[in-house]
Design a protein with these regions (language model features):
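Conserved SAM/AdoMet-binding glycine-rich loop
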Residues: 1-90
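Generic hydrophobic/packing signal
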Residues: 3, 34-36, 124-127, 148
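Short linear motifs at secondary-structure transitions and domain/linker junctions
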Residues: 5-8, 151-155
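Generic alpha-helix detector with strongest preference for long hydrophobic helices that associate
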Residues: 12, 27-30, 49-53, 62-66, ...
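Hydrophobic residues in alpha-helical segments
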Residues: 38-39, 145, 169
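Short, well-ordered secondary-structure micro-motifs
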Residues: 41-42, 70-72, 107-110, 140-143
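Conserved C-terminal portion of the radical SAM core fold
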Residues: 56, 79-141, 155-172
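Glycine-rich tight-turn/loop motif centered on a GG-T
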Residues: 69-75, 145-152
Length: 173
């Protein structure tokens, strides 16, 4: 797993050609990607990659709220994610977006849910997954970056946040 979009388009096209030669019945290739790496690619480059066999890009949106994104040091903004997802769509690629329920903690829960739904509404991802935030490297380490005011959501709070998200979500399909 990794962000293949960090590689130059020329190299990605070479890799896709090798995959297609080795696996003649290959149906699709997918990749994770960060919005900031897609910013370095043109729609034309992404279209070339699609024509060479790349079909799905998995984008870890995590949040559509700039304050949450800043606090978790994502290195992305609402606008950088929006731009990347619209570029994916324009190139004819399929987008699969992941958001993290509970990422804003108690303090930023509502704005996280609403702004994330708004970003999804604007970009209309093909697939949308919600995951619950976890702390594989420890909650204390997460707090160091987020700030001491982070209080994780209770189970009830997680359900309320997803309800707020869904109430503001308006996907066309």
């Amino acid at each position: 797993d990794g962000d293949a979009m960090v590689l130059p388009t020329r190299r990605l096209l070479e890799i896709l050609a090798e995959l297609n030669a080795a696996f003649p019945d290959l149906q699709r290739v997918s990749s994770y990607c960060l919005p900031r790496n897609l910013a370095k690619k043109t729609v034309e480059e992404l279209t070339q990659l699609r024509e060479a066999g790349l079909k799905i890009l998995y984008v870890g949106m995590e949040s559509g709220d700039d304050e949450v994104l800043r606090r978790i040091n994502k290195g992305e903004t609402w606008e950088s994610t929006r731009s990347a997802l619209l570029k994916i769509r324009e190139a004819g690629l399929t987008s699969s977006v992941m958001v993290l329920n509970g990422l804003g903690g108690e303090t930023l829960s509502r704005q996280h849910a609403i702004n994330t739904a708004t970003l999804c509404n604007e970009t209309q991802p093909d697939y949308l997954s919600t995951l619950v935030v976890s702390f594989p490297q420890g909650e204390e380490r997460f707090r160091e970056g987020f700030g001491e005011d982070f209080a994780p959501l209770s189970q009830h709070g997680l359900f309320e946040e997803i309800q707020t998200f869904l109430e503001h979500l308006n996907l066309e399909r």
